[in-house]
A protein has these predicted regions:
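Adenosine-nucleotide cofactor-binding segment
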Residues: 1-54
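Terminal peptide-recognition signature
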Residues: 18, 45, 57, 92, ...
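A general structural signal for well-ordered alpha-helical segments in protein cores
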Residues: 42, 54, 82, 103-107, ...
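C-terminal hydrophobic helical "lid"/dimerization subdomain
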Residues: 100-149
Length: 149
């Protein structure tokens, strides 16, 4: 995390795994994050979910904070009071486009075992239905991989 304090919002069942992977704090996704962390308490939010917690995440951001998003499994449409954006001078960015060379660097780090992707389960392509069921149960930590023959 390059010196950053990493706060993860997840289900309680994943807490120990996330702590073992380097999270400093794991908070229950159903708790009142604003009461727990306080307004203007974080510099950066990386959101993979969006949905109903979205407005709270913006309240957590400090002025000049950065909000990055790379998923919307909690709901693709969110409402923004644009005053929050301009009064706090927030920056929003997507996290799906990689600059040239990033993927090759990532692969080289994996090959050198400097970083390790977390794989929850591997399914053969023919078992894609079971893979989807496993994904929807939300009990896994890490990626669900489909093995293509």
């Amino acid at each position: 995390a390059r010196g950053a304090k990493v706060i993860v919002v997840s289900s309680p069942s994943k807490q120990q795994t996330l702590l073992s992977l380097g999270a400093d704090v794991v908070l229950n996704r159903n708790m009142d994050l604003l009461a727990e962390l306080g307004e203007n308490s974080v510099d950066v939010v990386i959101d993979l979910v969006a949905g109903e917690q979205w407005p709270t995440l913006l309240q957590l951001l400090k002025p000049k904070g950065r909000y990055g998003v790379s998923g919307a499994i909690g709901g693709a449409l969110v409402e923004l009071d644009v005053r929050t954006l301009y009064l706090k001078d927030l920056s929003f960015f997507g996290c799906t486009h990689l600059d040239e060379g990033v993927f090759a660097r990532l692969v080289s780090l994996i090959e050198a075992r400097a970083i390790r992707p977390v794989v929850a389960k591997v399914f053969d392509l023919q078992d894609i239905h079971q893979a989807q069921i496993t994904f929807l149960e939300k009990l896994h930590t890490g990626k669900i991989v489909l093995r293509v023959p």
